[in-house]
Amino acid sequence: MPRTYVIPDLHGRRDLLDAALLRIETHAGGKEATIVVLGDYVDKGPDSRRVIARLRAGVAPGLRLAMLKGNHDALMVAALRGDVAIANWMTKGGDTALASYGGDVADVPVHDIDWLDGRPLWHMDAHRIYVHAGVDPALPLAQQDPVLLMTKRYADDDASGHDAGEGARHVVHGHDRHADGPLLKQGRSNLDTYAWKTGRLVIGVFDDALPGGPVELIEITAPPAP
C-alpha cells in the first residue's frame, strides 16, 4: 500500500532536507507516496531561503508533496508584511532567516512570502491528521483555531488523537521539541527532535492502509548547530 513520509521542523537546515528527500526517494523505490512537511521551514538554522527554494522546486515523479504552515513561517510573513514588529521576529530566530536573504528585508522576494503564507494548516488522509503543532480533539477541523494548530503544546503524557465527528484519526505533529524523541503515543506522534540544533532529523513512515503511528522511522544525521 502507499506510504506517507513525514518530515518535521527543519528551521533552515537545507542539509537535512536534502538528505531526507534523497532517503525518502530511495525508500519509496519508485512507488507512489506522499511526503508531508510539518512546517517551520525558517528561522534559527542558517539556510531558510534555500529550504524554501528546495521545497518550491518539487520532488521526483510519483511523489506528492504536502507542505504545511508552522508558527515561525506565519511570524516571518507577519513581520515582513508589517503586521508585527521586525524586532519581534528577530528575537525568535528571524535574524538567521533574514541573514540567509542578505540581511535586508527589502531583499526577501514577495514570492517567498506569498508561498509561506499560502501553506495549508493541516493535511488529512483516511487514518491521520498532519498538523504543525496539534489539534483540539473535541472540535471538527473546520472549527479549529488556526493559531492553536500552529502553537499547541501537548502535555507529554497526553495520548489524545482526534475524534470529533470525522472519524478517529491519529495526529502527527512537530513543534514541541524532544531531542531524545520522537514521542510516540496511542493517539499522536510528535516527530520534532530539535533537528536544527542537534543535527538529528527523524522521518516518520506511515502505511496509508493502517491506522495509528509510524510503521518505520528513518533517521537523518548531520553536524549539530554551533
Pin down the residues of each PLM region.
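Conserved beta-sheet core of the metallophosphoesterase superfamily
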Residues: 147-220
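Short, well-ordered beta-strand micro-motif
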Residues: 124, 130-132, 203-207
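Active-site environment of divalent metal-dependent phosphoester hydrolases
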Residues: 11-15, 43-46, 73-77, 123, ...
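Active-site neighborhood of divalent metal-dependent phosphoester bond hydrolases
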Residues: 31, 44-124, 151-162
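Beta-strand-turn-beta hairpins that frame and shape the catalytic cleft
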Residues: 1-5, 123-129
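Divalent-metal (often Zn2+) His-rich catalytic cores of metallo-beta-lactamase-fold enzymes
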Residues: 129-130, 134-145
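N-terminal active-site segment of His-dependent metallophosphoesterases
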Residues: 1-54
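Active-site neighborhood of phospho(di)ester-bond hydrolases with catalytic His/Asp-centered motifs
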Residues: 7-8, 35-39, 66-70, 170-176, ...
